[in-house]
């Protein structure tokens, strides 16, 4: 059976990973001088506390080639084929690292690397669908063809509660952050064509919204 792997930006729960037999290549989180591997062991609340205390935002970096090789090697040694997903190539060099890892393992003909053109749940949906197809006995070529059809149809979006972290991360300027805070603006961030973009802004206390894909 084809092995499905993704980098950690798919944000799938441990329960889902185990249910669908999906392996993860962790990205790195850089917190000052400390570098951590992304995963369930990360304390999100502690990260926010650190960011607020230090008035900065943790950075992310692509996985190391060694880490990617270590995740893929057991399956290559078993003679299995692999489909590996990465966060959009517009947002990270993760896909290049995975490709180089396949080259180092002399397994380019055994590993199909898919640029999800997305992040978070947008990748997660594709990864789970690929795992279902693999469990159904689909070939690597069939799975890739199916996923290639789905990629342009999957669009992730999220509403930001505060502009502070976008400002600290260089995603918006100080004036926008100041005005946004004063007016209680909450931008909707949409991933489109592999890139993040501000689609619209909500004002006040956002309790629930469910815009149609066309609106997004």
Positions of predicted regions on the chain:
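Internal, active-site/partner-interface "lid" segment
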Residues: 134-193, 198
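Glycine-rich phosphate/diphosphate-binding loops that line cofactor/substrate pockets in enzymes
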Residues: 70-80
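Single conserved hydrophobic/aromatic residue that forms the stacking wall/gate
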Residues: 208-216
């Amino acid at each position: 059976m084809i092995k499905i792997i993704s980098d950690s930006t798919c944000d799938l729960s441990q329960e889902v990973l185990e249910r669908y037999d999906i392996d993860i290549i962790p990205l790195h989180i850089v917190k000052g001088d400390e570098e951590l591997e992304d995963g369930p062991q990360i304390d999100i609340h502690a990260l926010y506390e650190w960011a607020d205390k230090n008035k900065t935002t943790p950075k992310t970096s692509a996985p190391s080639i060694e880490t990617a090789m270590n995740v893929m090697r057991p399956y290559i040694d078993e003679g299995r084929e692999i489909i590996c997903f990465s966060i959009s190539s517009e947002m990270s060099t993760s896909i290049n690292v995975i490709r180089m890892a396949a080259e180092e393992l002399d397994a380019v003909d055994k590993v199909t690397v898919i640029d999800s053109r997305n992040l978070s749940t947008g990748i997660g949906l594709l990864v789970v669908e690929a795992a279902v197809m693999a469990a159904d006995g689909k070939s690597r070529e069939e799975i890739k063809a199916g996923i290639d059809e789905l990629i342009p149809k999957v669009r992730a979006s999220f509403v930001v509660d505060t502009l502070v972290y976008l400002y600290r991360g260089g995603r918006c300027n100080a004036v926008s952050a100041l005005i946004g805070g004063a007016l209680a603006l909450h931008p909707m961030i949409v991933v489109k064509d592999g890139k993040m973009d501000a689609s619209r802004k909500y004002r006040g206390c956002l309790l629930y919204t469910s815009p149609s894909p066309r609106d997004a």
